[in-house]
Structures are given as C-alpha cells and as structure tokens.
Amino acid sequence: MKRITILGSSGSIGKQTLNIISKMKENVCIEGLAVGSNIKILKSQIKKFKPASVSVNSPAEAQNLKKWCISNNIKTDVYKGNTGLEKLTTMPKTDMILAAIIGAVGLKSIIAAIKAKKDIAIANKEAIVMAGSYIMKLAAENGVSVLPVDSEHSAIFQCCTDEKKSQIKRIILTASGGPFYKYDKDFSKITVEQALDHPTWKMGRKITVDSATLMNKGLEAIEASVLFGVSIDKVEIIIHPQSVVHSMVEYVDGSVIAQLSNPDMKLPIQYALTYPERLPSNIKPLNLIEINKLEFYNPDFNKFPCLSLAYYAAQKGYTVPAVMNAANEMAVASFLNKEIKFTDIAKIVGRTIKTHKISKSTSLDTFIEADYWARHYAEKLINEI
C-alpha cells in the first residue's frame, strides 16, 4: 500500500488524482491533503478519503476546519500556512508527495519533502523551471525519485527509462498548439474567454492561458532539459493538434521511441503513482484507425514570442528561468483580471528578463530572491500599462 500526500488537492490535477485513487484502494491511500482556500472541496475530500492530516492557507479557516472536524467526529489533524505544508510533506508514513500547487509557491514544500526523503510526483513545472538544478541535485543526494506527472514528461520518462542519457540525440516535445496556432486575426484583441477555450485539455486557468501563449510549452522544454539532464538545444517542440503522440525521444542510432495514448491526464498521473508497476485503467483504448491521421507542424516563434523567451532563458540559465517564470505568473494573473492585453504578457516577460542582472549563485535563496525581484518588477510594468 503506497501512502500519498497531495499538495493542491482542490486543483485540476489534485482532483483527477483523487478520482484515480478512489478506484485503486487496494494499492494507494491518502495520507494528507493541502489546499489554498477551497475549504468546501477539502471538506468533501476529507469525508471521502479520511486523511490523517490536512493543511490550508488561512489560520482562521484552519481553526474553523478543526471545529468542523470535531463536530463531525473526524480524526484529521488540521494545519495552516507554510508550516502546515511542511508538516504534511514530512509525515513519517507518507511514501510519495504529489506536488500540484501551481506556481513558485510550491517550491519550499517540494524541498522539505525531498529532505524528508519522500519521492516526488511533480506536477508543478514552475518549481522545476525556477530552481530545477537545485531540486535535482538535492533529490540525488537524498536518494529521492522525481517522477513527472505532465503528459509530455511522463511520455519522455517512459521512452528513456532504460537508456543512457548520453545516447539521447534529441527530445521531441509535442504541443497541441492551443486555441491560436491557426489564428490569423489580431492577437491583441484576444479575450480571456477565448484564451481559456482550449481545444484538447481541460485545465486550470493559469496553465490554459500559458497553453494559449505557448509559454506552457516553453516551460515544459526547460523542465525536460532539467529532468532528463540534456541541454536545451536538444529539446525540440513540434505542434501536434491531435495530442495523441505525447512526446518522442530520438537516439544517436536514429531510433525514435514515442508514447501514444488518447489525451487523458489520468494516465500519466496513474503511472506516476504506481511506478514502476503498471495497473489496469479505464482510459479509452487508442484506435489509430479511428483517429485516421496524425499531423505535425513547426511552431511559429514570431507568432508566439513566449516560446523564444523560454529558450532564451534556458540558454542563459542561472536565475533567468526563475525571473521569466515569475514575470509570466504576474502577467497571466493580470490578463485573467482583464488588466492587460494578451500580447502584453510576452512584452512584460521580455522586458523583465532583459532588465534582470544574472546571478551565477546556485543557492536556493538566490532563486527565491530572483523570483521576488521579478514579481515586483513585472508588477511595476503592469501598473505602467
């Protein structure tokens, strides 16, 4: 029986993970759950999964939740804030942490989990982009496995588990293209509602906007470089609208290994939870005759400048990816609040990167300071628009 703690259980990945676990009760159980402020969802999860501990952001909400647990005769410990997250990640009985808190805020809890020698199922690509070299070094020192949850990185992982990284010629990262890869109108007129209308995946608001700008694919390119120990120039992005080929790995002998399935996040989530085993699932079987065709296109870096910014940040390295990620988080939040235009996202990220003075220190504090600086600088740019 594998005991799992989910950080971000009220989000899209968290809820899908719980749905999977509810059908795998003989193999996996829930030890802990953490949410930001969605107490209503957390209460329903507590009733169903009976975790030993939970954590919420607000001290007041934590106190109210404690009272609710007592009144309902529920024996679940309730914690709060960053301290609560750290308690959840270090619980002795937990075997694996599923890190699904979006953005850089999830970084410290991942670090705490690794130091407590907990395996990590990583759904927080921003943490890897921000401080990936630090995370992977720490994981190696503590004998911790970092298992990807993103469909693309799960695919890469499945394509190269038994191969030496030195034999990889390139990683081919597929992208659906989002809602705008064929869009030929004025990008500055794109609305929030249009950006949130993804043709393939149902995801959270922030990642859906990132998919629309293709920044999500840029972040994933950096994540692939870090997770699989290859230089960014060996990571190639191609547009694949059907989202059936989730990624490919080409080796030095010319062989290309791909992972295919119908687009369903439950598959990579389940694989991360059960690795190295594979268990039956209710994923719709792949029927290539029914699909009929698989299309592939080169991405347009001019049309989607966030892709160029991501590759630039990866090539510069050090603190630049952290700065890019933080500026993007700020810009996307402002776009979702209808404060800036769709095209302003890339402009804000680009100006923040170009103003940043690179630090070559690899300490965790350096990455956190770069993130802090970038958020404040991006906010300044947003206020000037």
Swiss-Prot record:
One of its GO terms (molecular function) is 1-deoxy-D-xylulose-5-phosphate reductoisomerase activity. It catalyses: 2-C-methyl-D-erythritol 4-phosphate + NADP(+) = 1-deoxy-D-xylulose 5-phosphate + NADPH + H(+). InterPro entries: DXP_reductoisomerase (IPR003821), DXP_reductoisomerase_C (IPR013644), DXP_reductoisomerase_N (IPR013512), DXPR_C (IPR026877), DXPR_C_sf (IPR036169), NAD(P)-bd_dom_sf (IPR036291). It holds the Pfam family DXP_redisom_C. Its cofactor is Mg(2+); Mn(2+). Mn(2+) binds at residues 150, 152, 220. Keywords: Isoprene biosynthesis, Manganese, Metal-binding, NADP, Oxidoreductase. Catalyzes the NADPH-dependent rearrangement and reduction of 1-deoxy-D-xylulose-5-phosphate (DXP) to 2-C-methyl-D-erythritol 4-phosphate (MEP). This is 1-deoxy-D-xylulose 5-phosphate reductoisomerase.
